[in-house]
Each structure stands twice: as structure tokens, then as C-alpha cells.
Amino acid sequence: MLTTRHPPHPVQGKKGKGKKGKKGPKDPTADKSIDFLYRQLVSDGIIQKVDHVQMKDYVGSFGHLGATFDKKAAEEMATRPWVPEPSPAQVRAMVTEFCVLPLGSQGVKDHAPLNTYINKKGNRAPKNGTPVLLCGSPGTGKKMLVHAVAHETGANLFNLTPSNTEGKYPGKKAYDMVHTALKVAKALPPSVVWIDDAETVFASGKKKGGGGEPPNRILKHLIACLEPKKGAALLEPEDRVLVLGTSAEPYLCEKAKDFSAFTGFFAKVLYCPLPNYPSRSMLWTAMLEKAGVERPNPDEVQTLARISEFYSAGSICKVVSKTLSTRRVERLARKPFSINELIGPLAKEEPVYATIEQEIQDWHLKTLNLGGGGDGDGGGGGKKKEGGKKKGGKKKK
């Protein structure tokens, strides 16, 4: 069902022919072929190999006792806004709906654009590149979901993460990097453009990374190619190109203008929570069976699920892979597996502290209060500024 469709003749060189009025962004590689640019991006590490993972590998259950927990949590948080967190199964369904289906099917992309929603002002226009943000604590499967989306759709993976582009295309050449990546992504659909640590791209300031370049150096070039103030954008909503951002610390965009730019850039913001109890049970069982343990004891699995609360799915997978090494699996027939072998390695893993998880949840609630996509003028940022000016004037008097 999910097939790759290549355009018969990638457009190069001249821009705007056949279209009246708007002119596209400057093309610094107009004299180079798509094949040459593709090889160049591969050699520079921008186009990367996709891991062999599928959406079903994001193991998790629905919240079967959600109504009970929701009622209890609502009573505890009566003084503040509260929205129940999604279960891993719901996250898997949302990523499939918003990312996999539109990217894998041109028919879905053309006739059922899922990057639109209804807000107070009416229908919001589709965004170029259909940007989607996955936010959640470290180890909650954001990177795996990126590779799963690319693998399920047979897409090319372009990595524009600041840490991956350090030392590459310095200075003014950053525009060439962004434009070339989006140009090749459009010419060879389906394509996924991945930006990890997305909060650093939208945080203002001149804080430099390890390579001497600020992480936000690609922001203005992304805006110039996707949402230009004048002229046509490089990508259109109909293109099977997905800009997928991931963030473990989205709350670092503290300033009102940074928050507005961050949430306003993405059409969808999806929260990846820590696994709940039934999801931890499923994950322990799946990982033990994958490692070579036949029919894990259900009572022992329930114990593991209880003691692994506040641990991420990544930590659970890491513990199983460390404990059940190839040599240990070969000795399972002579020395049966015991749950005690996992408790020590699990204790050495760093749990996700409640304060960190709460910060991410609060940030996600803030995006929902802005209408789910962070309209720049839909939240409290502008009102605070106006109020601040008035209060400041009174103090001066």
C-alpha cells in the first residue's frame, strides 16, 4: 500500500516557470543534479540509514483503567488545568495517523490532510512540510518512532539535528545545507526531515555548540524555505515530505517569543509519556521473549512492572539487553533465568524524576491552551506583555 513515487523530471535551475507571480527561494544548487546532491548529502552525514524498526515495536497498551485514574487525578489537581496523558498505544495510533498514512499515501495526503484542525478563528491552513513534534522524557521512544515512520513508508531520512550538523556548512553555507536537504527531499518522496533537540533550534541567543556554531543557526533558513514572508515556499502541503522534530526538554524555550515560534512552527505536538503499568508488563514480556526467554513467568513480569515505575522504556530495554547477553542466552538451558538478575542492573539505571516529567507535562498543557498548535497570538504571551507595559508605566509614575 505504501509506495514510493518519484517525479519524472526533477525541476532544476529556472524557478517560477509556469507559475504567475510568486518566486521561490534562492537556489544555490541550481546547476547540480539531484543525484549529485543526494550523494553529497550522504557523504556529509545528512542523509542517514534508517533503522529496521516498525510501529508495532513501540510496545504499549491502552489505558484500560483510564476513567478511574482520570477521576482520581482530576480530584487531586482541582486547582489547575489537567488533561489525561495518552497511553503508548494512543501515541502509536496518533503517529500512524498524522505521520505514516499521509507520508505513505499520496491519496491520503491530497484528500485528507491531517495537518489541519479547527480553532477559534476557523480552519487553519495546511503547513508546508507538515511539521510534527514528538516531546517526552529521555528514553520514551521518540527516536525509534522517527525511524519507524521512515521505515514503514520507505522514506529517505534527512538528519538536520544541530549536533549532527556541527562543523558542516559553516556560516552562510547553512542556508545551502537546509535548502539542499529540502530540495532533495521534495524531489525524492517520501522523505522525513528529522530535527532532534528541536528546542535548541528555537531558543533565542547566541549560545554556541561544540562546533562553534549556535544550534539555532538553521531556524531562519527553515522559515525562509517553508514559511517565507514573500514569494513561494520550497515545499507545498501536497508534497510527501514530513518535518519531524523531537524534544526531551521543550520547556527550555522559556521566552514568550521562543515558545510562540516553537509551537507555532509545528502543526501537531504529540506527547510521549512514560509507560504505564500495563505497558511496562507488555514491554518486559516482549523484551524477555525477544532475548530468548521462553514464556516468562507472569507473576515475575508483574513484579518487574511494579518496581520499574518511573523508568523509561529505553531503560527497560537497556537492562534486558545488558543482562541477557549472547553468552547468557546460550546457558539458559543449564541455568534457568531468574528475575533477580534484572533487579541489580535496573537499580543502576537513572529514573525519570517526577519534577522533570511534570515540567514536560506542564509545557504540553500550555500548548493545548494555545489551541494545540501554538498560535502566536492565541495564548497568554501577548497579554502578559501588554499588562507588563501598563504596570511598568504606573511604577514609573
Locations of the language-model features?
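Ser/Thr-centered, proline-biased regulatory motifs
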Residues: 15-20, 380-397
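Conserved AAA+ ATPase small/helical "lid" subdomain
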Residues: 238-242, 269-270, 274-276, 281, ...
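Extended, charged/polar low-complexity intrinsically disordered regions
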Residues: 1-99, 103-104
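Eukaryote-specific, cytoplasm-facing alpha-helical/coiled-coil scaffolding segments in long proteins
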Residues: 133-142, 310, 348, 368-374
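Polar/charged alpha-helical tracts
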Residues: 39, 43, 60, 75, ...
